[in-house]
Protein backbone atom coordinates (compact mmCIF):
# COMPACT_ATOMS: atom_id res chain seq x y z
CA UNK A 1 0.00 0.00 0.00
CA UNK A 2 1.03 3.59 -0.72
CA UNK A 3 0.30 6.35 1.77
CA UNK A 4 0.30 10.01 0.75
CA UNK A 5 0.18 12.70 3.44
CA UNK A 6 -0.81 16.18 2.30
CA UNK A 7 1.23 18.82 4.13
CA UNK A 8 1.60 21.72 1.71
CA UNK A 9 -0.94 24.21 3.07
CA UNK A 10 -0.10 27.70 4.29
CA UNK A 11 -2.23 27.67 7.45
CA UNK A 12 -3.03 31.38 7.34
CA UNK A 13 -5.42 31.21 10.28
CA UNK A 14 -2.61 29.98 12.52
CA UNK A 15 -1.09 33.47 12.22
CA UNK A 16 2.39 32.04 12.51
CA UNK A 17 5.61 31.85 10.50
CA UNK A 18 5.82 28.17 11.42
CA UNK A 19 4.23 25.85 8.82
CA UNK A 20 0.90 24.62 10.14
CA UNK A 21 1.84 20.93 10.15
CA UNK A 22 4.86 21.67 12.36
CA UNK A 23 2.89 23.16 15.22
CA UNK A 24 3.30 20.85 18.20
CA UNK A 25 0.66 18.63 19.70
CA UNK A 26 1.77 16.65 22.75
CA UNK A 27 5.35 17.70 22.15
CA UNK A 28 5.75 16.70 18.51
CA UNK A 29 4.64 18.21 15.19
CA UNK A 30 1.14 17.50 13.95
CA UNK A 31 2.67 15.88 10.88
CA UNK A 32 4.82 13.56 13.00
CA UNK A 33 1.68 12.12 14.61
CA UNK A 34 0.24 11.35 11.18
CA UNK A 35 3.49 9.75 10.00
CA UNK A 36 3.68 7.60 13.13
CA UNK A 37 0.14 6.35 12.53
CA UNK A 38 0.87 5.73 8.86
CA UNK A 39 3.90 3.61 9.73
CA UNK A 40 1.75 1.19 11.72
CA UNK A 41 0.04 0.26 8.44
CA UNK A 42 3.43 -0.76 6.98
CA UNK A 43 3.19 1.07 3.63
CA UNK A 44 5.64 0.23 0.86
CA UNK A 45 5.76 3.91 -0.12
CA UNK A 46 5.21 6.80 2.31
CA UNK A 47 5.13 10.20 0.59
CA UNK A 48 4.67 13.61 2.20
CA UNK A 49 3.55 16.39 -0.14
CA UNK A 50 5.17 19.66 0.94
CA UNK A 51 4.75 23.23 -0.25
CA UNK A 52 4.65 26.15 2.18
CA UNK A 53 7.78 25.97 4.35
CA UNK A 54 8.92 22.90 2.45
CA UNK A 55 12.50 22.87 3.74
CA UNK A 56 11.44 23.25 7.36
CA UNK A 57 8.94 20.43 6.97
CA UNK A 58 11.51 18.17 5.32
CA UNK A 59 14.01 18.82 8.08
CA UNK A 60 11.48 18.17 10.84
CA UNK A 61 10.29 14.75 9.67
CA UNK A 62 13.12 13.47 7.46
CA UNK A 63 13.58 9.70 7.75
CA UNK A 64 14.77 6.87 5.49
CA UNK A 65 11.21 5.65 4.91
CA UNK A 66 9.75 9.08 4.07
CA UNK A 67 9.79 10.51 0.54
CA UNK A 68 8.82 14.04 -0.39
CA UNK A 69 6.89 15.49 -3.30
CA UNK A 70 6.57 19.24 -3.84
CA UNK A 71 3.39 21.17 -4.62
CA UNK A 72 4.78 24.49 -5.79
CA UNK A 73 1.35 26.12 -6.03
CA UNK A 74 -1.47 25.20 -3.67
CA UNK A 75 -4.09 24.36 -6.31
CA UNK A 76 -6.17 21.94 -4.26
CA UNK A 77 -6.06 18.45 -2.81
CA UNK A 78 -6.41 16.71 -6.16
CA UNK A 79 -3.45 18.64 -7.53
CA UNK A 80 -1.45 17.83 -4.38
CA UNK A 81 -1.95 14.08 -4.75
CA UNK A 82 -0.92 14.35 -8.41
CA UNK A 83 2.52 15.55 -7.31
CA UNK A 84 3.04 12.33 -5.36
CA UNK A 85 1.99 9.92 -8.12
CA UNK A 86 5.47 9.43 -9.68
CA UNK A 87 6.73 8.13 -6.32
CA UNK A 88 3.97 5.54 -5.83
CA UNK A 89 3.55 1.90 -6.76
CA UNK A 90 0.78 1.98 -9.39
CA UNK A 91 -0.22 -1.61 -8.68
CA UNK A 92 -1.02 -0.96 -5.00
CA UNK A 93 -3.84 1.11 -3.50
CA UNK A 94 -3.11 4.59 -2.18
CA UNK A 95 -4.36 5.93 1.14
CA UNK A 96 -4.53 9.75 1.36
CA UNK A 97 -4.09 11.38 4.78
CA UNK A 98 -3.69 14.96 6.00
CA UNK A 99 -0.80 16.40 7.95
CA UNK A 100 -3.09 18.54 10.09
CA UNK A 101 -5.39 15.69 11.19
CA UNK A 102 -3.27 14.06 13.90
CA UNK A 103 -5.62 11.91 15.99
CA UNK A 104 -6.97 9.32 13.55
CA UNK A 105 -6.54 5.82 14.96
CA UNK A 106 -4.60 3.27 12.95
CA UNK A 107 -7.50 0.82 13.41
CA UNK A 108 -9.86 3.27 11.73
CA UNK A 109 -7.60 3.49 8.69
CA UNK A 110 -7.12 -0.27 8.64
CA UNK A 111 -10.89 -0.76 8.57
CA UNK A 112 -11.21 1.66 5.65
CA UNK A 113 -8.52 -0.02 3.56
CA UNK A 114 -9.93 -3.48 4.27
CA UNK A 115 -13.42 -2.37 3.28
CA UNK A 116 -12.16 -0.92 -0.01
CA UNK A 117 -9.98 -3.90 -0.81
CA UNK A 118 -7.25 -3.94 -3.43
CA UNK A 119 -9.19 -2.21 -6.21
CA UNK A 120 -11.99 -0.33 -4.47
CA UNK A 121 -12.56 3.32 -3.61
CA UNK A 122 -13.13 4.04 0.06
CA UNK A 123 -14.04 7.26 1.85
CA UNK A 124 -13.85 7.90 5.58
CA UNK A 125 -16.98 9.81 6.58
CA UNK A 126 -18.48 11.02 9.84
CA UNK A 127 -21.94 12.21 10.82
CA UNK A 128 -21.93 15.52 12.69
CA UNK A 129 -24.61 17.44 14.56
CA UNK A 130 -23.18 20.58 12.96
CA UNK A 131 -21.62 19.77 9.57
CA UNK A 132 -20.90 23.41 8.72
CA UNK A 133 -17.74 23.93 6.69
CA UNK A 134 -17.40 20.36 5.46
CA UNK A 135 -18.07 18.64 2.15
CA UNK A 136 -21.32 16.66 2.19
CA UNK A 137 -21.75 13.01 1.19
CA UNK A 138 -24.55 12.88 -1.38
CA UNK A 139 -26.14 9.44 -1.71
CA UNK A 140 -28.55 8.09 -4.32
CA UNK A 141 -31.96 6.50 -3.72
CA UNK A 142 -30.30 3.18 -2.91
CA UNK A 143 -28.07 4.80 -0.28
CA UNK A 144 -24.91 4.51 -2.35
CA UNK A 145 -22.42 7.38 -2.55
CA UNK A 146 -23.16 9.48 -5.63
CA UNK A 147 -20.81 12.42 -5.11
CA UNK A 148 -19.16 14.70 -2.58
CA UNK A 149 -20.14 18.37 -2.62
CA UNK A 150 -18.00 21.01 -0.96
CA UNK A 151 -19.75 23.47 1.36
CA UNK A 152 -19.29 26.46 -0.95
CA UNK A 153 -20.73 24.55 -3.90
CA UNK A 154 -23.64 22.88 -2.07
CA UNK A 155 -27.33 23.62 -2.62
CA UNK A 156 -29.56 24.48 0.36
CA UNK A 157 -30.87 20.89 0.34
CA UNK A 158 -27.36 19.44 0.30
CA UNK A 159 -26.36 21.68 3.21
CA UNK A 160 -28.91 19.81 5.33
CA UNK A 161 -26.90 16.58 4.96
CA UNK A 162 -25.15 15.62 8.22
CA UNK A 163 -22.75 13.01 6.80
CA UNK A 164 -19.54 14.75 5.82
CA UNK A 165 -16.34 13.92 3.99
CA UNK A 166 -13.23 13.76 6.17
CA UNK A 167 -10.96 13.93 3.13
CA UNK A 168 -9.33 10.60 3.94
CA UNK A 169 -9.70 8.21 0.99
CA UNK A 170 -8.21 5.04 -0.41
CA UNK A 171 -8.23 4.30 -4.14
CA UNK A 172 -6.49 2.17 -6.79
CA UNK A 173 -3.42 4.19 -7.70
CA UNK A 174 -3.26 3.71 -11.46
CA UNK A 175 -6.92 4.63 -11.95
CA UNK A 176 -6.66 7.47 -9.42
CA UNK A 177 -3.91 8.99 -11.55
CA UNK A 178 -6.18 9.02 -14.60
CA UNK A 179 -9.06 10.54 -12.66
CA UNK A 180 -6.86 13.26 -11.18
CA UNK A 181 -5.55 14.18 -14.63
CA UNK A 182 -9.15 14.78 -15.72
CA UNK A 183 -10.10 17.05 -12.82
CA UNK A 184 -11.43 20.54 -13.51
CA UNK A 185 -11.31 23.59 -11.27
CA UNK A 186 -14.66 25.13 -12.21
CA UNK A 187 -15.79 25.55 -8.62
CA UNK A 188 -16.10 28.33 -6.05
CA UNK A 189 -12.52 27.84 -4.86
CA UNK A 190 -10.96 27.51 -8.30
CA UNK A 191 -9.15 24.39 -7.09
CA UNK A 192 -8.76 20.79 -8.21
CA UNK A 193 -10.74 18.83 -5.63
CA UNK A 194 -9.70 15.28 -4.79
CA UNK A 195 -13.35 14.69 -3.91
CA UNK A 196 -14.38 15.10 -7.57
CA UNK A 197 -12.64 11.80 -8.30
CA UNK A 198 -15.53 10.06 -6.53
CA UNK A 199 -17.92 10.72 -9.42
CA UNK A 200 -15.29 9.47 -11.88
CA UNK A 201 -14.89 6.27 -9.88
CA UNK A 202 -18.66 5.73 -9.92
CA UNK A 203 -18.78 6.39 -13.67
CA UNK A 204 -16.03 3.79 -14.06
CA UNK A 205 -18.26 1.23 -12.38
CA UNK A 206 -16.76 1.27 -8.88
CA UNK A 207 -18.97 1.35 -5.83
CA UNK A 208 -17.61 3.93 -3.41
CA UNK A 209 -17.65 2.41 0.07
CA UNK A 210 -17.52 4.29 3.35
CA UNK A 211 -16.55 3.64 6.94
CA UNK A 212 -16.81 5.86 10.00
CA UNK A 213 -14.43 6.29 12.94
CA UNK A 214 -15.37 5.26 16.45
CA UNK A 215 -15.07 8.87 17.66
CA UNK A 216 -15.66 12.18 15.89
CA UNK A 217 -12.41 13.66 17.18
CA UNK A 218 -10.41 11.21 15.06
CA UNK A 219 -11.14 13.32 12.00
CA UNK A 220 -10.75 16.79 13.49
CA UNK A 221 -8.19 18.99 11.75
CA UNK A 222 -6.23 22.03 12.84
CA UNK A 223 -6.77 25.37 11.13
CA UNK A 224 -6.37 27.74 14.07
CA UNK A 225 -4.67 27.99 17.45
CA UNK A 226 -8.07 27.44 19.07
CA UNK A 227 -8.49 24.13 17.26
CA UNK A 228 -4.93 23.16 18.12
CA UNK A 229 -5.66 23.75 21.80
CA UNK A 230 -8.87 21.72 21.56
CA UNK A 231 -7.07 18.76 20.01
CA UNK A 232 -4.32 18.98 22.63
CA UNK A 233 -6.91 18.59 25.38
CA UNK A 234 -8.63 15.72 23.56
CA UNK A 235 -5.32 13.94 23.17
CA UNK A 236 -4.30 14.49 26.79
CA UNK A 237 -7.70 13.27 27.97
CA UNK A 238 -7.21 10.09 25.95
CA UNK A 239 -3.73 9.56 27.40
CA UNK A 240 -4.93 10.14 30.95
CA UNK A 241 -7.85 7.79 30.45
CA UNK A 242 -5.52 5.04 29.21
CA UNK A 243 -3.29 5.51 32.27
CA UNK A 244 -6.28 5.25 34.60
CA UNK A 245 -7.44 2.07 32.89
CA UNK A 246 -3.91 0.68 33.35
CA UNK A 247 -4.12 1.31 37.10
CA UNK A 248 -2.19 4.57 37.47
CA UNK A 249 -3.52 6.95 40.13
CA UNK A 250 -3.94 10.50 38.80
CA UNK A 251 -4.85 13.21 41.30
CA UNK A 252 -6.59 15.11 38.48
CA UNK A 253 -6.62 13.60 34.97
CA UNK A 254 -7.28 17.06 33.50
CA UNK A 255 -4.02 18.40 34.91
CA UNK A 256 -1.53 16.02 33.30
CA UNK A 257 0.47 16.50 30.09
CA UNK A 258 2.26 13.63 28.38
CA UNK A 259 4.37 14.90 25.47
CA UNK A 260 5.90 11.63 24.39
CA UNK A 261 5.54 8.16 25.90
CA UNK A 262 4.96 7.40 29.57
CA UNK A 263 5.25 3.81 30.79
CA UNK A 264 4.09 3.09 34.33
CA UNK A 265 4.38 0.05 36.57
CA UNK A 266 1.89 -0.99 39.23
CA UNK A 267 0.63 1.42 41.89
CA UNK A 268 2.17 4.54 40.38
CA UNK A 269 0.73 7.82 41.69
CA UNK A 270 0.98 11.17 39.88
CA UNK A 271 -0.11 14.46 41.45
CA UNK A 272 -1.38 17.53 39.58
CA UNK A 273 0.32 19.70 36.95
CA UNK A 274 3.02 17.21 35.98
CA UNK A 275 4.57 17.19 32.50
CA UNK A 276 6.25 14.14 30.96
CA UNK A 277 8.30 14.61 27.80
CA UNK A 278 10.17 12.21 25.53
CA UNK A 279 10.40 8.64 26.86
CA UNK A 280 9.73 8.30 30.58
CA UNK A 281 9.46 5.08 32.58
CA UNK A 282 8.08 4.97 36.12
CA UNK A 283 8.57 1.62 37.85
CA UNK A 284 6.26 0.09 40.48
CA UNK A 285 5.19 2.24 43.44
CA UNK A 286 6.72 5.47 42.15
CA UNK A 287 5.12 8.62 43.54
CA UNK A 288 5.35 11.89 41.62
CA UNK A 289 4.49 15.07 43.51
CA UNK A 290 2.82 18.14 42.03
CA UNK A 291 4.33 20.44 39.40
CA UNK A 292 7.15 18.14 38.28
CA UNK A 293 8.68 18.07 34.79
CA UNK A 294 10.30 14.78 33.73
CA UNK A 295 11.94 14.27 30.35
CA UNK A 296 13.70 11.17 28.96
CA UNK A 297 14.21 9.49 32.32
CA UNK A 298 13.83 6.16 34.07
CA UNK A 299 12.65 6.22 37.69
CA UNK A 300 13.17 3.10 39.81
CA UNK A 301 10.64 1.27 41.96
CA UNK A 302 9.49 2.94 45.15
CA UNK A 303 11.14 6.26 44.41
CA UNK A 304 9.45 9.44 45.62
CA UNK A 305 9.72 12.61 43.55
CA UNK A 306 8.55 15.62 45.51
CA UNK A 307 7.03 18.86 44.23
CA UNK A 308 8.64 21.11 41.60
CA UNK A 309 11.39 18.65 40.71
CA UNK A 310 12.83 18.78 37.17
CA UNK A 311 14.44 15.67 35.71
CA UNK A 312 16.02 15.39 32.25
CA UNK A 313 18.08 12.58 30.76
CA UNK A 314 18.57 10.88 34.12
CA UNK A 315 18.54 7.38 35.59
CA UNK A 316 17.17 7.02 39.12
CA UNK A 317 17.36 3.80 41.11
CA UNK A 318 14.89 2.26 43.52
CA UNK A 319 13.64 3.87 46.75
CA UNK A 320 15.34 7.18 46.10
CA UNK A 321 13.97 10.51 47.32
CA UNK A 322 14.10 13.60 45.10
CA UNK A 323 13.08 17.16 45.85
CA UNK A 324 11.25 19.28 46.47
CA UNK A 325 12.83 21.71 43.99
CA UNK A 326 15.57 19.31 42.88
CA UNK A 327 17.03 19.29 39.38
CA UNK A 328 18.60 16.33 37.59
CA UNK A 329 20.26 17.23 34.30
CA UNK A 330 21.46 14.93 31.50
CA UNK A 331 23.90 12.27 32.61
CA UNK A 332 22.72 12.18 36.21
CA UNK A 333 22.64 8.64 37.61
CA UNK A 334 21.28 8.10 41.10
CA UNK A 335 21.63 4.67 42.66
CA UNK A 336 19.17 2.99 45.02
CA UNK A 337 18.17 4.80 48.22
CA UNK A 338 19.98 8.00 47.32
CA UNK A 339 18.59 11.39 48.29
CA UNK A 340 18.72 14.64 46.32
CA UNK A 341 16.93 17.39 48.20
CA UNK A 342 15.75 20.94 47.80
CA UNK A 343 17.73 23.22 45.50
CA UNK A 344 20.24 20.52 44.61
CA UNK A 345 21.40 20.22 40.99
CA UNK A 346 23.08 17.10 39.62
CA UNK A 347 24.59 17.01 36.13
CA UNK A 348 26.64 14.27 34.43
CA UNK A 349 27.32 12.68 37.80
CA UNK A 350 26.84 9.42 39.67
CA UNK A 351 25.45 9.38 43.21
CA UNK A 352 26.06 6.03 44.87
CA UNK A 353 23.72 3.86 46.91
CA UNK A 354 22.45 5.55 50.04
CA UNK A 355 24.33 8.79 49.39
CA UNK A 356 22.64 12.07 50.24
CA UNK A 357 22.80 15.65 49.05
CA UNK A 358 19.85 17.19 50.81
CA UNK A 359 20.30 20.95 50.53
CA UNK A 360 21.60 23.73 48.27
CA UNK A 361 24.27 21.84 46.35
CA UNK A 362 25.73 21.60 42.85
CA UNK A 363 27.19 18.24 41.80
CA UNK A 364 28.59 18.26 38.28
CA UNK A 365 30.92 15.87 36.44
CA UNK A 366 31.36 13.75 39.54
CA UNK A 367 31.53 10.12 40.66
CA UNK A 368 30.26 9.78 44.20
CA UNK A 369 30.37 6.46 46.01
CA UNK A 370 28.00 4.84 48.48
CA UNK A 371 26.86 6.27 51.82
CA UNK A 372 28.37 9.69 51.18
CA UNK A 373 26.95 12.73 52.93
CA UNK A 374 27.13 15.97 50.94
CA UNK A 375 26.58 18.95 53.24
CA UNK A 376 24.50 22.00 52.41
CA UNK A 377 26.14 24.54 50.13
CA UNK A 378 28.68 22.12 48.65
CA UNK A 379 29.90 22.95 45.14
CA UNK A 380 31.93 20.85 42.74
CA UNK A 381 34.03 23.39 40.83
CA UNK A 382 34.27 21.52 37.55
CA UNK A 383 34.86 24.22 34.93
CA UNK A 384 37.90 26.41 34.34
CA UNK A 385 36.32 28.46 31.57
CA UNK A 386 37.41 26.10 28.82
CA UNK A 387 37.45 22.53 30.15
CA UNK A 388 35.37 20.33 32.45
CA UNK A 389 37.04 18.14 35.09
CA UNK A 390 35.72 15.34 37.31
CA UNK A 391 35.45 15.09 41.06
CA UNK A 392 35.71 11.61 42.57
CA UNK A 393 34.40 10.95 46.07
CA UNK A 394 34.76 7.39 47.32
CA UNK A 395 32.49 5.46 49.72
CA UNK A 396 31.64 6.65 53.25
CA UNK A 397 32.98 10.18 52.85
CA UNK A 398 31.49 13.00 54.92
CA UNK A 399 31.51 16.37 53.18
CA UNK A 400 30.74 19.27 55.51
CA UNK A 401 28.61 22.26 54.62
CA UNK A 402 29.91 25.06 52.39
CA UNK A 403 32.66 22.93 50.84
CA UNK A 404 34.20 23.66 47.44
CA UNK A 405 35.80 20.76 45.59
CA UNK A 406 38.08 22.09 42.85
CA UNK A 407 38.33 19.45 40.13
CA UNK A 408 40.17 17.41 39.16
CA UNK A 409 40.27 16.03 42.68
CA UNK A 410 39.75 12.71 44.51
CA UNK A 411 38.52 12.23 48.06
CA UNK A 412 39.30 8.70 49.20
CA UNK A 413 37.21 6.30 51.25
CA UNK A 414 36.10 7.35 54.72
CA UNK A 415 37.58 10.85 54.62
CA UNK A 416 35.96 13.77 56.42
CA UNK A 417 35.91 17.30 55.02
CA UNK A 418 35.25 20.01 57.56
CA UNK A 419 32.68 22.72 56.93
CA UNK A 420 33.85 25.69 54.90
CA UNK A 421 36.79 23.86 53.33
CA UNK A 422 38.13 24.41 49.83
CA UNK A 423 39.61 21.14 48.55
CA UNK A 424 42.03 21.42 45.64
CA UNK A 425 44.31 18.47 46.43
CA UNK A 426 43.50 14.77 46.74
CA UNK A 427 42.41 13.65 50.22
CA UNK A 428 43.72 10.39 51.69
CA UNK A 429 41.45 7.68 53.09
CA UNK A 430 40.04 8.27 56.61
CA UNK A 431 41.71 11.69 56.79
CA UNK A 432 40.24 14.92 58.11
CA UNK A 433 40.81 17.88 55.86
CA UNK A 434 40.14 21.49 56.78
CA UNK A 435 41.41 24.95 55.93
CA UNK A 436 43.02 26.69 58.92
CA UNK A 437 41.13 29.87 59.59
CA UNK A 438 41.57 32.26 62.48
CA UNK A 439 38.47 33.65 64.11
CA UNK A 440 38.88 37.12 65.53
CA UNK A 441 36.46 38.73 68.00
CA UNK A 442 36.37 42.43 68.91
CA UNK A 443 34.49 43.31 72.07
CA UNK A 444 32.51 46.50 72.31
CA UNK A 445 32.14 46.79 68.55
CA UNK A 446 29.67 49.43 67.40
CA UNK A 447 27.91 48.76 64.15
CA UNK A 448 27.81 51.71 61.71
CA UNK A 449 24.46 53.45 61.38
CA UNK A 450 22.93 55.40 58.54
CA UNK A 451 22.92 59.15 58.83
CA UNK A 452 19.48 60.64 59.19
CA UNK A 453 18.61 63.18 56.51
Swiss-Prot record:
Segments of this protein annotated with the region Linker: 226-246
Keyword presence, Acyltransferase: yes
Gene3D superfamilies: Hexapeptide repeat proteins, Spore Coat Polysaccharide Biosynthesis Protein SpsA, Chain A
The reaction(s) this protein catalyses: alpha-D-glucosamine 1-phosphate + acetyl-CoA = N-acetyl-alpha-D-glucosamine 1-phosphate + CoA + H(+); N-acetyl-alpha-D-glucosamine 1-phosphate + UTP + H(+) = UDP-N-acetyl-alpha-D-glucosamine + diphosphate
Spans annotated as Pyrophosphorylase: 1-225
Binding site for UDP-N-acetyl-alpha-D-glucosamine: 6-9, 20, 71, 76-77, 98-100, 135, 150, 165, 223, 329, 347, 362, 373
UniProt: acetyl-CoA binding residues: 376, 382-383, 401, 419
GO cellular component assignments: cytoplasm; membrane
Cofactor: Mg(2+)
Superkingdom of origin: Bacteria
Subcellular location: Cytoplasm
EC number: 2.7.7.23, 2.3.1.157
Pfam families per the UniProt record, alphabetical: Hexapep, Hexapep_2, NTP_transf_3
Cofactor, free-text remark: Binds 1 Mg(2+) ion per subunit.
Pathway as given in its UniProt record: Nucleotide-sugar biosynthesis; UDP-N-acetyl-alpha-D-glucosamine biosynthesis; N-acetyl-alpha-D-glucosamine 1-phosphate from alpha-D-glucosamine 6-phosphate (route II): step 2/2; Nucleotide-sugar biosynthesis; UDP-N-acetyl-alpha-D-glucosamine biosynthesis; UDP-N-acetyl-alpha-D-glucosamine from N-acetyl-alpha-D-glucosamine 1-phosphate: step 1/1; Bacterial outer membrane biogenesis; LPS lipid A biosynthesis
Key words of the record: Acyltransferase, Cell shape, Cell wall biogenesis/degradation, Cytoplasm, Magnesium, Metal-binding, Multifunctional enzyme, Nucleotidyltransferase, Peptidoglycan synthesis, Repeat, Transferase
A GO molecular-function descriptor: magnesium ion binding
Residues at the catalytic site: 359 (proton acceptor)
Described purpose of this protein according to its UniProt entry: Catalyzes the last two sequential reactions in the de novo biosynthetic pathway for UDP-N-acetylglucosamine (UDP-GlcNAc). The C-terminal domain catalyzes the transfer of acetyl group from acetyl coenzyme A to glucosamine-1-phosphate (GlcN-1-P) to produce N-acetylglucosamine-1-phosphate (GlcNAc-1-P), which is converted into UDP-GlcNAc by the transfer of uridine 5-monophosphate (from uridine 5-triphosphate), a reaction catalyzed by the N-terminal domain.
Family: In the N-terminal section; belongs to the N-acetylglucosamine-1-phosphate uridyltransferase family. In the C-terminal section; belongs to the transferase hexapeptide repeat family.
Subunit structure: Homotrimer.
Classification via HAMAP family: GlmU
Protein name: Bifunctional protein GlmU
Taxonomic source organism: Paraburkholderia phytofirmans (strain DSM 17436 / LMG 22146 / PsJN) (Burkholderia phytofirmans)
Lineage: Bacteria, Pseudomonadati, Pseudomonadota, Betaproteobacteria, Burkholderiales
Name of the gene encoding the protein in the UniProt record: glmU
Amino acid sequence: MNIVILAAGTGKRMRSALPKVLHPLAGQPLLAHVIDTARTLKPTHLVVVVGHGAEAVRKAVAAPDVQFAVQEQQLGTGHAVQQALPLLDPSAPTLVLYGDVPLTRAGTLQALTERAGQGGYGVLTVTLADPSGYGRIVRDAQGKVARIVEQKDATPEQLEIAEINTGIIVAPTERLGRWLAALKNDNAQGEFYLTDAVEMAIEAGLEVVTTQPEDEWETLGVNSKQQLAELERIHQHNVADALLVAGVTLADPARLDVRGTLECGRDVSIDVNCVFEGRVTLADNVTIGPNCVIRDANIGAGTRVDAFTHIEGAEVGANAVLGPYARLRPGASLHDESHVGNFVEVKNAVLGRGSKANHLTYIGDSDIGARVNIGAGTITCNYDGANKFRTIIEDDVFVGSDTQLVAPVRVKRGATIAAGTTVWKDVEADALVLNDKTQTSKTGYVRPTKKKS
